Amino acid sequence: MTKPLILASQSPRRKELLDLLQLPYSIIVSEVEEKLNRNFSPEENVQWLAKQKAKAVADLHPHAIVIGADTMVCLDGECLGKPQDQEEAASMLRRLSGRSHSVITAVSIQAENHSETFYDKTEVAFWSLSEEEIWTYIETKEPMDKAGAYGIQGRGALFVKKIDGDYYSVMGLPISKTMRALRHFDIRA
């Protein structure tokens, strides 16, 4: 019998992407506080957070296979989290305007006797944005729950000049790499 699969995330985008695999799974949100370790690189931080999220749920459900994930938007060595308010969202979008940044998504899969954690890094270039474009976007409320204050799968796509890497990773779950990793847990789509 296959072990139950759990997604340890409340992200509607991650749910949407995991649905593409057409596998039965449940959602149990991890209560891990998303604090960064200043001694870690962005890649180390995002992997550490994904692992903590998956482990927190796996510890409560030891007979399940648990997927945890985390995404960070990084510019000039600084990681941009979710904006706290509209002013911070505007500030983030001004910084991203006309520039390239990295989006790093880590996935951690935890099971009783096996675990796997990896990350995917994608480069995204933005067009130059006017103040009007920034504030019109913020008024949609779309940027308020997203790292870097934009969603590539929504109106934020209008800001993207070029993407080099996995689009789905920018959305929050590199689905192809995740499926390949799940094969190591005897799960196939």
From Swiss-Prot:
Phenotype caused by lack of the gene: Not essential for cell division.
One Pfam family of this chain: Maf
Gene Ontology CC, one term: cytoplasm
Site, Important for substrate specificity: residue positions: 13, 71, 153
Cofactor(s) named in the record: a divalent metal cation
UniProt keyword annotation of Cytoplasm present: yes
Key words of the record: Cytoplasm, Disulfide bond, Hydrolase, Nucleotide metabolism
Catalytic residues (positions): 70
Cysteine pairs bridged by disulfides in the record: 74-79
One GO MF term: nucleoside triphosphate diphosphatase activity
Subcellular location: Cytoplasm
Enzyme class: hydrolase
EC number: 3.6.1.9
Assembly behavior: Homodimer.
Function: Nucleoside triphosphate pyrophosphatase that hydrolyzes dTTP and UTP. Can also hydrolyze CTP and the modified nucleotides pseudo-UTP, 5-methyl-CTP (m(5)CTP) and 5-methyl-UTP (m(5)UTP). May have a dual role in cell division arrest and in preventing the incorporation of modified nucleotides into cellular nucleic acids.
Protein name: dTTP/UTP pyrophosphatase
Gene source species: Bacillus subtilis (strain 168)
Gene name of the record: maf
